[in-house]
C-alpha cells in the first residue's frame, strides 16, 4: 500500500492515501508505527502539494494522526516527537507551513492546528503583531507604555 502511495499513478495514489489515512485514524499505535516504518510519511507529505483539496486534506489527516501517536509515545519520556522529526525530514513541515496560504479554509485550519500542536509554531497573524515596526528609520517593538507618573525605582 505504501509503495502504491509513493509510486503509482495519481488515481491509485489517491485511493492509497484514503486507505492509509483511514488506517491511521482507526489503527493502534503499533499499526501506525508499522506504516511509518514502511515509509508512508514522505509520500503523504508529497501529496500536500497537490491541487485536489480533498486529497490534501486526507494527507493532512493521516499526518496529524501519525503525529498524535508520536506525541503520545514521546510524552512519558519527556522526549522529542520522533514522528514530527520524520515529517520535517520529509519536507512536510515546510509544505504544511506553505499550506497556511491555501484558499480552502479547512486546509488552513488543519495546518494551523498541526503547526501549533506538534511543531510549536504560532499562527502567522499572531506572529505578525510581534514584528517590529519601522518609523523614521527606527524600529519599534511594541513595548508597553510607561505607567502614568513614570517608573519608581526607589524600592519603596
Q: What is the predicted function of each stretch?
A:
Residues 36-37, 41, 45-50, 142, ...:
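Long alpha-helical HEAT/HEAT-like repeat alpha-solenoid scaffolds in very large eukaryotic proteins
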Residues 1-2, 43-46, 93-97:
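Buried hydrophobic core positions in alpha-solenoid tandem helical repeats
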Amino acid at each position: 500500500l505504501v509503495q502504491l502511495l509513493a509510486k503509482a499513478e495519481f488515481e491509485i495514489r489517491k485511493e492509497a492515501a484514503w486507505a492509509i489515512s483511514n488506517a491511521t485514524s482507526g489503527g493502534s499505535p503499533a499499526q501506525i508505527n508499522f506504516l511509518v516504518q514502511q515509509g508512508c510519511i514522505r509520500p503523504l507529505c508529497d501529496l500536500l502539494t497537490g491541487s485536489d483539496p480533498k486529497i490534501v486534506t486526507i494527507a493532512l489527516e493521516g499526518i496529524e494522526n501519525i503525529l498524535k501517536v508520536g506525541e503520545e509515545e514521546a510524552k512519558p519520556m519527556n522526549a522529542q516527537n520522533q514522528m514530527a522529526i520524520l515529517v520535517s525530514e520529509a519536507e512536510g513541515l515546510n509544505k504544511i507551513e506553505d499550506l497556511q496560504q491555501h484558499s480552502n479554509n479547512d486546509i488552513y485550519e488543519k495546518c494551523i492546528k498541526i503547526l501549533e500542536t506538534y511543531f510549536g509554531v504560532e499562527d502567522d497573524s499572531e506572529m505578525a503583531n510581534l514584528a517590529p515596526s519601522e518609523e523614521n528609520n527606527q524600529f519599534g517593538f511594541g513595548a508597553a507604555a510607561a505607567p502614568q507618573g513614570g517608573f519608581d525605582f526607589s524600592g519603596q
